[in-house]
Regions:
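Mixed-charge (acidic/basic) macromolecular-recognition segments
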Residues: 5-136, 163-193
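Short basic (Lys/Arg) and small-residue
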Residues: 139
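Short, glycine-biased loop/turn motifs at secondary-structure junctions and
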Residues: 142, 151, 159-165
Length: 196
């Protein structure tokens, strides 16, 4: 299971008799969570990059996991609009580092839910002057769709996600890398040492 420490990684390489991460074929056999990442994990990602990503993912709480799923959907939509190609590992890491730059509305799963949320919480000032009897006539789905499209939000199975600020670039992203042994150490119990 991942993430693993750098020394656990080196031990695994030693057990399969390789020192080069390029010689290692890897695949994810089972996702316990984050299964929506599967289409974005490809053979160009090194085992060290994958380990760095899983290390970041292991730090996320439930709200942040939902934020990541929403951010990924937004990034995929952006790529589709710009013909930007596949999502890179650096983008996945950047998204995982930016989960706190979002609002997550856990009980909002549709345009209608979103429209009701915005109207009932006073975010649509243009509708505040309406008499209470007019609220029953509002098309909440249309209002929600307009708001979602204007703020480029995304629905996930766990709620609605919208960015609250611009995404920040990664701070000097450098995945774990292979470190060759610098010292080989043999340990033994001093009491069992034979005296000559």
């Amino acid at each position: 299971t991942f993430p693993v420490s750098q020394y656990e990684m080196m031990d695994a390489f030693e057990q399969i008799h390789t020192k080069s991460p390029g010689d290692v074929y890897w695949q994810v056999d089972e996702f316990y969570c984050f299964d929506y990442l599967a289409p974005h994990l490809d053979e160009s990602m090194s085992i060290f990059e994958f380990n760095s990503l899983t290390e970041q993912l292991s730090k996320l709480d439930e709200r942040q996991e939902t934020a990541l799923e929403g951010l990924l959907q937004m990034q995929v939509n952006k790529h589709m609009q710009e013909n930007g190609g596949p999502i890179t590992v650096q983008e996945l890491m950047m998204l995982a580092h930016n989960v706190d730059h979002c609002h997550v509305l856990a009980d909002v799963h549709s345009n209608e839910d979103l429209g009701k949320f915005y109207v009932e919480n006073g975010f649509r000032e243009d509708l505040d002057a309406l008499p209470d009897s007019a609220y029953a006539l509002l098309d909440y789905a249309k209002i929600g769709k307009q708001m979602r499209e204007s703020e480029a939000g995304a629905f996930t199975p766990h709620g609605y996600v919208v960015r609250t600020e611009e995404l920040q670039p990664l701070p000097d992203y450098e995945p774990q890398r292979d470190i060759n042994y610098m010292i080989r150490l043999t340990l033994m119990n001093h009491e069992n040492e034979q005296k000559t």
